[in-house]
Regions:
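Bacterial N-terminal signal peptides that target proteins for export
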Residues: 1-12
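Compositionally biased, intrinsically disordered or flexible polar/acidic segments
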Residues: 14, 22-161
Length: 161
């Protein structure tokens, strides 16, 4: 599952969670697998995995920012531990999580601790999940959506590009 964010003029993705949940991602069906990622903070809140903008996707971790996309960190000393950091960039950036095929309930928390933000989220770099979600400086909103993940292999042979 790949999450794509574009900034117009400012995008911040904060506490992206994935549990077969991305921010938090959970499968909408099947065995529950949960990932809770916190972006941009100095220290992760309890139960979250800290993700720095420098963390590149690897098969070993199963998650990270895709090559060629390096957001920057925004931090604030105000607010609770979960809302003290964010990642942002003037260009789109991609964060991927390796998950098996299935339907996933994904919750993202969007906002920026210091500036107004406008965020667009796409799944697998193409499917629009959230468009131009605007948040005021220091304000955060959570949104939940379902992502259907399918591999390129077809069970009867062949492959989808």
């Amino acid at each position: 599952m790949t999450c794509f964010a574009a900034r117009y003029p400012l995008v911040a993705m904060f506490a992206l969670v994935a549990a077969a949940s991305l921010g938090s991602a959970q499968p909408a069906s099947g065995p529950v697998t949960a990932f809770k990622f916190q972006f941009g903070a100095e220290k992760a809140a309890a139960g979250y995995t800290l993700v720095s903008p420098a963390l590149k996707y690897s098969k070993e971790t199963g998650y990270g920012f895709e090559s060629g996309t390096t957001p920057t960190t925004v931090r604030s000393d105000t607010g609770d531990a979960l809302h003290r950091g964010a990642v942002t960039d003037a260009q789109p950036f991609l964060f991927s999580v390796a998950v098996p095929e299935g339907n996933y309930r994904v919750t993202v928390t969007l906002g920026d601790p210091t500036e107004e933000a406008m965020t667009t989220v796409k799944a697998e770099t193409r499917r629009l999940m959230l468009e131009r979600i605007r948040t005021a400086a220091g304000k955060f909103v959570s949104r939940t959506f379902t992502v259907n993940v399918r591999g390129p292999k077809i069970s009867t042979g062949g492959e989808v590009n």
